[in-house]
Amino acid sequence: HMDHGEGMFHSKVQPTWVTPHPTDSKVYVTGNASHEIIEVDTNAWKITNRFKTAGKAPYNTDISSDGSRMVITLKGEGKTEIKNLKTGKSKLVNNTTKVSHGVVISPDNKFAFISVEGIGGEPGKLDVVDIRKAKLVSSIEVGKQAGGIALWKIEE
């Protein structure tokens, strides 16, 4: 038995997700507990920027294929943040329930698909957000524990 006299250590950042930039040598780390996104230059492996999110507990992120916008789920608020990576400005969209989880952007960069967990016995949902308008445009129930989400392009 080893007792070092210390309790369990919890990171002040509590990273939950890493998203690579589609055109630059950068990755973005989601700091759930620190309410921030951390930009890392992958050529030098150094932090090059840290920016606070517009709400609490960012969880997952995705970046548009042109690298201009980042969509961030704010699990602590039941909202989605759409951030313009060039200007730094953000817009918030309310999700249909309180526990926003996964996010993926459509290949045409028009929509963000957000998996939203149900609470208790409630079904989870898939919210669809128009990225340019920063507006919820559709939602559908998908069953319990709607967690992550992914899209892929099928070519003929």
Language model regions located:
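Predominantly soluble domains enriched in secretory-pathway, periplasmic, or organellar proteins
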Residues: 1-156
